[in-house]
A protein has these predicted regions:
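Bacterial N-terminal signal peptides that target proteins for export
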Residues: 1-9
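Bacterial Sec-dependent signal peptides at the C-terminal "C-region" and cleavage site
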Residues: 12-29
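A short glycine-rich, His/Asp/Glu-containing loop-to-beta-strand
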Residues: 33-59, 64-69, 135-163, 169-172, ...
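Short beta-strand His + acidic residue motifs that chelate non-heme Fe in jelly-roll/DSBH
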Residues: 58-60, 78-79, 100, 106-114, ...
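Glycine- and acidic-residue-biased ligand/ion/polar-headgroup-sensing regions
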Residues: 64-83, 167-186
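Short acidic-glycine-tyrosine-enriched beta hairpin
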Residues: 83-103, 188-204
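Ligand-binding loop in jelly-roll beta-barrel domains
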Residues: 103-127, 204-226
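Surface-exposed beta-loop interaction hotspot
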Residues: 108-156
């Protein structure tokens, strides 16, 4: 029999590897990732603002439902899947959108801000997928997944969208700050001073126009449930 002390190096290495393995952080649900700041939760969706300072990384986290991401700032970021190398940087600018279909195949990843600016994104997690999706559209569709459609309006000062109707609940998001004027078919109107990242959830049928009553270009995103 070999002396017991000949096994010590192997035992130490196995113990070290086991400790390293057990100390590796497990992925967390997206709403528990500390850079994802929860702003709204209801039966239909979660709205989170994701903020990473230059050089910061998120934790590994899991997206398990369809989602929409809306960029609010200029950024350069990578993503990394577990046990995979970091991706090449992706450049983004305000108003860019990303729609993913994840209910059948959840995504686990982490994000690394490799740019000089703030990584600033609204992440909208769509909690329900309709059994009978609406076929009515409110305007030109900028993107869609099985849970929602996205409309993007870029408004020069004084410009107005066509009158359009949201048959389904929707989320309206300000990409840029400007004076937004909303007008109903009866002529009743409301003007709001909005800031980048402001949003409003609407659960009733709405018909309106959107107008830029300010002096600079405005961008609005509408995420309408199907």
């Amino acid at each position: 029999m070999k002396p017991w002390f000949n096994l010590a190096p192997t035992f130490v290495l196995l113990t070290l590897f086991a400790a390293q393995e057990s100390s590796a952080p497990a992925p967390v649900p997206v709403e528990q990732e500390p850079h994802h700041h929860l702003l709204l939760k209801n039966d239909y969706l979660l709205v989170m603002r994701v903020v990473l300072q230059p050089g910061e990384r998120s934790l590994y986290h899991v997206h398990s439902v369809d989602d929409v991401a809306v960029w609010l700032g200029n950024s350069s970021a990578t993503q990394q899947l577990p046990n995979e190398p970091e991706s090449a940087p992706a450049e983004q600018k305000p108003g860019n959108i990303s729609l993913r279909t994840l209910r059948e195949a959840p995504l686990t990843h982490r994000v690394h801000n490799v740019g000089q600016g703030l990584f600033d994104v609204l992440d909208v997690e769509l909690l329900q997928r309709p059994e009978h999706p609406s076929t009515a559209v409110a305007g030109p569709v900028a993107g869609e997944n099985p849970s929602a459609r996205v409309y993007k309006w870029t408004l020069a000062p004084g410009s107005v969208t066509p009158m359009h109707t949201h048959e389904r609940p929707y989320l309206i998001i300000a990409v840029t700050g400007f004076q937004l004027k909303m007008t109903a078919p009866d002529g009743q109107s409301f003007t709001h001073e909005i800031k980048p990242g402001d949003f409003h959830w609407v659960s009733t049928k709405v018909t309106h126009t959107l107008a830029n009553a300010g002096n600079g270009e405005g961008q609005i995103i509408e995420i309408e449930l199907k």
